[in-house]
Structure formats: structure tokens, C-alpha cells
Amino acid sequence: MNPIDTDDLEKHTPMMRQYLTMKAEHHDMLLFYRMGDFYELFYDDAKRASELLGISLTARGKSGGDPIPMAGIPYHAVEGYLAKLVQIGQSVAICEQIGDPATSKGPVERKVVRIVTPGTLTDEALLQERQDNLLAAVYQGKVGFGYATLDVSSGRFVIAELETKESLEAELQRTNPVEILYSEDFGAMELLHHFKGKRRRPEWEFDYDTSIKLLLAQFGTKDLHGFGITDARLSLQAAGCLMQYVKDTQRTALPHINAITRFNQTDTIVLDAATRRNLELTQNLSGGRDNTLAAVLDNTATAMGSRMLQRWIHQPLRDHAQIFARQTAVNELLETTAHESLHEQLKALGDIERIMARLALRTARPRDFARLRQALNLLPKLQQSLAQLSAPHTVKLGQLLGEFPEEQQLLERAIVDNPPMLIRDGGVIREGYNAELDEWRGLSEGATDYLVQLEAREKERTGIATLKVGYNRVHGYYIEVSRLQSQQVPLNYQRRQTLKNMERYITPELKEYEEKVLSSQGKALALEKQLWDELFDLILPKLHELQAFARAAAELDVLSNFAERAETLGYTCPELSSEIGVKIEAGRHPVVERVSQTPFIANPVTLYNQRRMLIVTGPNMGGKSTYMRQVALITLMAHIGCFVPADRAIIGPIDRIFTRIGASDDLASGRSTFMVEMTETANILHNATAQSLVLMDEIGRGTSTYDGLSLAWSAAEYLAQQVGAMTLFATHYFELTQLPELMAGVYNVHLDAIEHEDTIAFMHAVQEGAASKSYGLQVAALAGVPARVIKAAKHKLHQLESRDHQVEGVNVNGTRAPIQTLLALPEPVENPAVSKLKAINPDNLTPKQALDLLYELKRLS
């Protein structure tokens, strides 16, 4: 049966009619339907939940004549199951009982109070604390794309206007949203195939006028001029759809979403999707975080600092003034050792950024208030530490931290030291905060003394020494005696419950007291909930200032972390230059040096106007790719304000970093390894400029040697002579080492190896000049190729060398053949039939002439 078919509701029980009506309103997600202590799922939802969560699939009688598939989840364990579902891209509607079962006629009143989707999470238990949790929307116009992202757990709202598919792909790679909304007419689905949380939305949700109205209402402004985004039409349409989706799922006000910013690629170094992937910035090639740049650089004290660091890594700055401000702050923290005390103080702050989002959404829990109180208690000490520092950027951040004495005192008076998890449990509001609450609690808490006194009195009155007075939630207060002694109870004892060996009674006095106590408990809980709600109203007027406090603290954390990393890992402050070039002395790969079991060999690189391209040669496993990547990573680190793993680094203006390193088949798009490689190469050749840093590794593999060599030669020539980009060009085509003889600005460098009998030792040191050979057979032996195969290969090699034979134009001994021989290929001769066909003017031919020409073309072919 289809649970969203509401045409035949009368066939079903009242409870199932209620369920089916709600399911019809939330047909595109799982519906968790609260029944007592369980959330139940029915029909297809039950089958899907059973499959996804590994829970039992049962049946709940019949409704409408058919068995009802059913699966259930205990309410107290729901967060764990929700976490599993959102991790695989599922959305869930939470339907709660809001009516009183005791007074309800028919099904208890229920309501969907919460919709959980991967991109709208704010619950601490469901979020990954050190990763942004982004909801995105994309809209395709006639020319270009609009892209918007929102982190509901922090309120960060960003849009971008993107001209090409490639730039959209790069943004998707950079932001890595957990849920993405797209229009019905979106025409680039191949870019979204690997995202789990995809949501197709109707075209009208992207309407421009509706989007503007939504955003103006959200920000409480008359126009959007103050945000500098009025010309970003496509991305505003995406932002409008995104805003409506969040309103629909959160079902509450969203005061923490109070601004929107525009991401301009011109402000940052452009990193395309391939570059972000190849450099393993925040995610390794296997999809994890181990052995990434972020893993090495991240020793932040707070989760919000960790998230900011990852955003910085993906957005290296181009403005030298902003970079210098960060460097100055880091340098002062390092020289004064202030980073040590700051790290400890910041560690105690907690994740204020996400706590403020939960406060804004009124989903905060008691322990969120306790953590906020702790952070505000620490603020004066943090301010005192910053007062000793003079770097302008640090001073500015200190001012943004703000002061909140009233809020701190309020939370100190209102919240107990160690509050319970949930407000419904009570015991959150501190004694003395509210006199009426204290009075109701006093009645309830005095019950213990009363019951002790009652038990002693009744034992004496009845003479039953084993008599006990107790309480449970089902039957309330009771007087318990053994069955053997039940004949001795007074006449005013009324039987309440019979057990195997016991009888439980209640007296009019105890009944009256029970009603009084339970009434006081209920009133205490109700009043405590009211006071709890009022706390939100008292704190939220300072929401914007508290959000600024969180952002400033996160940035201080990142800068302090940079100082610690520089001290611990031996990094130096890079110098920024206005002249184009990259000069690194004794540079090291930041990740490889941390995981290597042997000392890392530091290497230099020098690129400037008269030395723009380095042809990098050397054996496989010699370290060419590591060398190239370290140049890119050091350059990137310099542009986020971080110190770098080098003795000295001088970095000039950089607009883009490109990498063409490694490749594999793109099965989803039906592209071979060679096609992927050529696509990435084409992107570089089209978009690189004289201020770009380009890494090209092994261009031309996957095709014939003539084709590969020709492509590699032409690409290198184009980059050197037409583009003028700063380029590291690694190759096994030794013929390319003759390029320096033919083109200005091109130089050879190589990574050497030492051969001893049948073994090879890689030196990993970069030296000027070209490599002498490739050591292919030795590397094959190290890789475990059978000795028999290696022996046969050596025999074949000697045969070929003795004949001075070339295989497809490349000397098999690895030495360079004359470039004229290799590239001076004969011009292709046109087929005579094609020449004849090109010369024909069909408009001037008679039928007889046309027939004769057909015979002539047949003969020529």
C-alpha cells in the first residue's frame, strides 16, 4: 500500500488516518511517529528504516484490510538512529504527541515538531564538531550558475556567482555540502552525482522576486545594498530557495541568520577541484582526514577554530595586507609565548558558535547554557591576556570579544552548576533564583521526611514491624505489608496493588498528601519550564554580539595554533614580495615530513621572470611528485598567514594554483584516465596566467609515445612561451630536457639516485640539470616484479641497445635521442580522393559529370 494515498482514509482506523494524513504532508522523508515510548514507522518507511538501520520489521495488525509493516525505535535512543540516517543523506520528520492521552477522545493529538535533514542539523550529538555542516542550493541560469551555502549551526550565509561548470565544481569541492538543493531544470547533474543529500526542488522556489522578499524579511532590511549583493541575481535565487527550505524544516524564527556575504574568487587564490583533491588539503584521496594538510596544521583548542582553519586552507588570500596582519599577530604570539596561555584559555571556551545557533533556534539544552556561562566567566581573563599584546589584528580581535557581565551574572544566578541533559527532567534552575519555584520544590522535596515519619507512625499504630511506605511512578504512594500480615491492617487501609507476597494500600491521609505533592511537582516543572523559556528572551538580545565573540575567539584560536605549529614543527615566516616569483630555501613537504620514518630531505626551488619553468626529471619513487606538491603547499600556507616548512621563503603574487598530478578513471562520467588527464590539462592551458603556479606531472601517459611526447612538448612550450606561468613540469620523456636549449626561461632540475649492482638508492635531493636515466627496471624489481620477468626484460634491453634501436622514437636505454628525429615527423599527405572531393563544386556539375566523378573517386580511394 502507498502510505501517501489519502483517498480511502475511511477504510483505516482513526490512528492510522492520523498517520497517513501526516505522512502525505511529508512524503519525501521518513516519518518518526511517536507512540508512547517508541517512534514507530509504517509501510514503506518501516521497510526502508529496517534496511538502513538494521532494526526488526514486524506487522501491526491490519488497517484497511491489509497487514501494516511496522518498525520501532525507543525514544531515548532516537539521536543515535538519527545520526546514522543523516550520515547517509536521509531526512526525518519527528512527530510528537502534544495532547494528553488521559483526556483525549480518539487518537492523541500529534504534530510534526521537528524536521531533521543532513544540512539543517544543530544538535550537538548529530554534528561532526570539527567540520562545517553546509546546506547548499544551486541554480542554473542561461549563462552561469548561482550558488548559496548556509551553515544553520552557525548562521554563516554565503553566495557566489559562477560563470562555468568548472568554477561550480571547484566551489562544490571547496564547500563540500552535506545536502544540496537544485532546480528541476538543473543541467549539470554530473557534478552532483557523488553527493548523498540531493534534493530536487520545484522551479518556482527559485523565483527571483520571492527570494528577495524572503531575504529582506529575514534580515529586517528595506533592500540588500548594504550587503553588496544586488547584482548577484542567480545566487540570490539560490539563496531564496535555501532560505525557504530552512524555514520549512526548522519551523521557528532564525535570528542567528542575520547577514549574507558574497564570495569573490578575485579575493582568493583560485584552486580548482582537481587541485584541492590532488593536494589533499582537508580530505585525502580515500575520503578521510589522515595525512592531509589540515591534519598537520590543526592543533586548535576549539572546534570552531578547527572549522575556521579548514575554511582558511580552502580560501588562501591574495591581499598581502591581510596576510601580513595575520603574520604579525602570529609572530607576536610566538615571540611572547602568549600562544601557550591562550591555547589553554581557549580550550575551556567550548563551541560557542554552535551554542549560539541553538540558543537562536531555542533548541539549546541546559548544558549549553552552562557552557556559555563558563565561556563568559573566562572572558575577563582572556581579555587580560590580550591586553599584553600590541599587534593591530590581535587588538582588533580583543575588541570584538566584547563584554557580557549582565549575561554572565544572569546565568550564574539561574543555572545550577551541573545541570541535567534536558529541561523536562527539572533541576535546572538554581535555588534562590525564583521564590515561587523554591516554594513548590520545598513541598515536593519535603516528601521524603514526611514518608519516614508516616512509616514510623503507622508501624507503631498497627504493630506491623515490616510495614514500609514507598512510591513508584505507576501507582504513586503506597503502604506495603506482607500478605501474611495483611489481616492486621486498619479499616482505613484501601488496597491499591496486590503482589505475589505483598499487599499495597493507601489511606485517605496518604492520598491527600500524594495529590498535594504531585501537584507541587507538576507546578514546579511547569514554572521551571517557563523560567527556562524566559532565559532565552533575556540572552537573545545580545545574540549578534555573542556571535561576534565566537568568531573572534575562533580566529584567535587559529592564529595561536599557527604560532604553536611554527614552534613545534620548525616553521619560518614567509616573506611576501610584489615581484612575481617563488623562492624557497630548504623547503619540506609539511605532511610527508610528519609521517616519514626517515629524515626528510629539504629541497630548494627558484622561479622568477627569467626562470619560469623547471623540467623535473628523475626515477619513479625519486620524489618528483612530493617535491612539486611541497612547493604548492608552502605557497598556499604562506597565503593563509601560516608559517612554512622552509629555512626561507619569498613568495610573489599568485592568482591560481593548478595541479595535474595523478589520475584515475572517472567511471561516473564515463571518462578514461587519459581523458581525465587531458581535461585537467586543457583547464590549465585555458586559465593559467603569468601569476599562476602550475604543477604538471607525467603529461602524455596513456597513449602512444609519439602522441604523449608531442602533447607533453606542446603543453610545456605553450606554458613557457604563451602563458609564462611559474611551472614545475615533471616528465619521463627525456627529450623534454632539451627545451632549455630552445626556449628562454626553461631550466632542468632532477632528483638523483645511486645504482649499486642490482639495487638503487633514491637520494631525494633536487639538483640542477637533467637526469641521466630512469632506472625503470630497478624500480620494477623493488615493486616485486618476479625476478624471472626482470631478467627477461634486461635481456631484451641489451638486445635493443645493441641494435641502437628506438621504440616509437624513444631510446630504450633512457638516453636522449636527437630532438629533430623525434619531433620532425613528416607532414601527413592528403588522400588524392579527398583532394579531388574538395575541388568539386556540386552546383556546376551535370548528372553525367557527377556520375563520372563518382567512378573517379572510387578509383582514387
Curated annotation (Swiss-Prot):
GO cellular component: cytosol
Binding residue positions for ATP: G618, P619, N620, M621, G622, G623, K624, S625
Record InterPro entries: DNA_mismatch_repair_MutS (IPR005748), DNA_mismatch_repair_MutS-lik_N (IPR007695), DNA_mismatch_repair_MutS/MSH (IPR017261), DNA_mismatch_repair_MutS_C (IPR000432), DNA_mismatch_repair_MutS_clamp (IPR007861), DNA_mismatch_repair_MutS_core (IPR007696), DNA_mismatch_repair_MutS_N (IPR016151), DNA_mismatch_repair_MutS_sf (IPR036187)
Iron-sulfur as UniProt keyword: no
Keyword Zinc included in the entry's annotation: no
Coiled-coil residues: none
Keywords: ATP-binding, DNA damage, DNA repair, DNA-binding, Nucleotide-binding
CDD domains, A to Z: ABC_MutS1
GO molecular function (one): damaged DNA binding
Matches recorded under Pfam families: MutS_I (PF01624), MutS_II (PF05188), MutS_III (PF05192), MutS_IV (PF05190), MutS_V (PF00488)
Entry-linked Gene3D superfamilies: 1.10.1420.10, 6.10.140.430, DNA repair protein MutS, domain I, MutS, connector domain, P-loop containing nucleotide triphosphate hydrolases
GO biological process per UniProt: mismatch repair
PANTHER family: DNA MISMATCH REPAIR PROTEIN MSH1, MITOCHONDRIAL (PTHR11361:SF34), DNA MISMATCH REPAIR PROTEIN MUTS FAMILY MEMBER (PTHR11361)
Family: Belongs to the DNA mismatch repair MutS family.
Protein function: This protein is involved in the repair of mismatches in DNA. It is possible that it carries out the mismatch recognition step. This protein has a weak ATPase activity.
Protein name: DNA mismatch repair protein MutS
